[in-house]
């Protein structure tokens, strides 16, 4: 007897299970999840409704969704993709094929994140794969830009400004960018510094304080670690 699909996925991943879409949303509320694999046919809340809820709710909209279905008609496939499914796999399929899809989605997201983190002029909204995520990043960046000069500006201030709980805010930033809120704030300070250095109108020490660092030496150390070059040697 073949093992259930979720059991076969445990060879590669830590797997959490749910019997239907309602249970799945409860799991997402209580755990940090990288990806959802869902059957379309489920009681209470089916896979289409689950996918729609995930992709339209800011708490989960960054999570990739793979839908599995016995429906082979093209209309069902179109419906799944229109609801935001990242992959749509028809039964029967091999677990190897499912694993390849999961791996591809996770690794492509990881490549995007690395490019964003290491490239001074790549904006955070390139990481947004849904409308909800894009709006979230725009709002967050407006708040950060308005407070960039303030070295005391913190994760708590960001969460309060967005009217989110600390835990929801942390999980959202981590899910979209794979950074903690404080890491992201520091990265945005450094990206703004790179922009100012590119414009060439201010000295390094002035830029350091403009973007909210207290210490020029610490600023230079962070800049070097992030972008592989010292601020004084940086040419945009």
Task: Indicate where each model-derived feature is located.
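Acidic, metal-coordinating helix/loop segments flanking the phosphotransfer/catalytic sites
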Residues: 17-35
């Amino acid at each position: 007897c073949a093992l259930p699909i979720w059991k076969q996925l445990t060879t590669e991943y830590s797997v959490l299970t749910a019997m239907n879409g309602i249970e799945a949303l409860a799991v997402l509320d209580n755990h940090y999840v990288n990806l959802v694999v869902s059957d379309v046919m489920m009681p209470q809340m089916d896979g289409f409704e689950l996918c729609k809820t995930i992709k339209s709710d800011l708490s989960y909209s960054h999570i990739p969704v793979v839908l599995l279905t016995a429906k082979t008609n093209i209309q069902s496939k179109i419906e799944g993709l229109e609801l935001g499914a990242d992959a749509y796999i028809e039964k029967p399929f091999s677990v190897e094929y499912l694993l390849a899809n999961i791996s591809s989605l996770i690794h492509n997201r990881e490549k995007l994140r690395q490019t964003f983190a290491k490239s001074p002029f790549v904006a955070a909204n390139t990481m947004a794969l849904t409308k909800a995520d894009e709006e979230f990043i725009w709002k967050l960046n407006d708040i950060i830009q308005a407070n960039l000069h303030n070295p005391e500006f913190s994760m708590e201030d960001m969460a309060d400004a967005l009217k989110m709980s600390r835990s929801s805010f942390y999980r959202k930033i981590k899910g979209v960018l794979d950074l903690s809120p404080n890491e992201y704030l520091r990265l945005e300070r450094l990206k703004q510094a790179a922009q100012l250095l590119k414009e060439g109108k201010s000295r390094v020490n002035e830029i350091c304080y403009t973007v909210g660092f207290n210490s020029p030496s610490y600023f230079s150390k962070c800049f070097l670690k992030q972008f592989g070059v010292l601020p004084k040697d940086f040419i945009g």
